[in-house]
Amino acid sequence: MNMDIASFFSGAGGLDLGFTKAGFNIVFANDNWKGCWKTFEKNHGIKINKKPIEWLKPSEIPDVVGFIGGPPCQSWSLAGSMCGADDPRGKTFYAYVDLVKEKDPLFFLAENVPGIVSRTHLPEFKRLVNSFIDIGYNVEYKVLNAKDYGVPQDRKRVFIVGYREDLNLKFEFPKPLNKKVTLRDAIGDLPEPKPALEKNRSNGENLEVPNHEYMTGTFSSRYMSRNRVRSWDEVSFTIQAGGRHAPCHPQANKMIKVGPDKFIFDPESPKPYRRLSVRECARIQGFPDDFIFYYKNVADGYTMVGNAVPVKLAEELAKKIKKDLEGVLN
């Protein structure tokens, strides 16, 4: 059975890697952020289409069984500007809907931040879901936490999955796995990383483990407003797209609360406080060590890793979709 799919807002390709592991074949990828192009092409072996999604013509996209993608989430996030579809980045979601309508794949998957189903954005989110229903899809959505699917990270995201109506299928989200993966499991064997060079430039190939370097610099008052350390036997905090907000490595003690929204580093900590390295973040997101991230400034490395869908979670969703499709098409 043909398992060719198209990827949008591809980034480094965490969603793509998970779907590939489940037996799908990425034949088209699109992202207009140049910071991810080399990383995607080197690791996935296909050329990326570099246009903004609004400029894409349906004729440029091959016929595929499915569409996958996570439209930019800053416009829907609780930490961001909360302007939703009024933000140009929010409008890209509707460009995705239009392409699904034109190409009519058997299924689509979209991922976004949980802020999209917050009270502020819920009416807009329901309009978005209805726009998929109106073009002939049975749509299901759910907030999933990656830690329930073998990912060593607290990370809640909304997943929307639609099956074309003529398949008579309803997507049921996979049940959580009875398997907790900890920070120790994910990063405990890594050697000491290197700090980034001046102005957070990358060490490039002068690293024992690729991308095993961390952002230096001060910690903002926002960063110090809560504890940023999880212990070895816990899962990580959410890996964010900004290196400045990368969690601290578990070698240090948990931070101490000294007032409302004010924490300090424990002066008694046996080891220093530092941000997780790009490779540590990548491991937490499920990328193997032979998946190399290419960047000149470590900030771009953190952005690629933090924007990705955790590979293991993507794979679990993909396996369920593949099983459903095989059930009706074979």
From Swiss-Prot:
Per the record's keyword annotation, is DNA-binding included, yes or no? yes
GO BP annotations of the record are: DNA restriction-modification system; methylation; negative regulation of gene expression via chromosomal CpG island methylation
Q: What is this protein called?
A: Type II methyltransferase M.MthTI
Write out the similarity annotation.
Belongs to the class I-like SAM-binding methyltransferase superfamily. C5-methyltransferase family.
| The keyword DNA-binding appears for this protein | yes
Active site: residue positions: 73
- By its UniProt entry, which CDD domains does this protein fall under? Cyt_C5_DNA_methylase
Q: What is its EC number?
A: 2.1.1.37
Domain SAM-dependent MTase C5-type: residue ranges:
3-328
Extract the NCBIfam families matched here: dcm
Pfam families reported in the protein's UniProt record: DNA_methylase (PF00145)
Which reaction equations make up its catalytic activity?
a 2'-deoxycytidine in DNA + S-adenosyl-L-methionine = a 5-methyl-2'-deoxycytidine in DNA + S-adenosyl-L-homocysteine + H(+)
One Gene Ontology MF term: DNA binding
Instruction: Cite the entry's keywords alphabetically.
Output: DNA-binding, Methyltransferase, Plasmid, Restriction system, S-adenosyl-L-methionine, Transferase
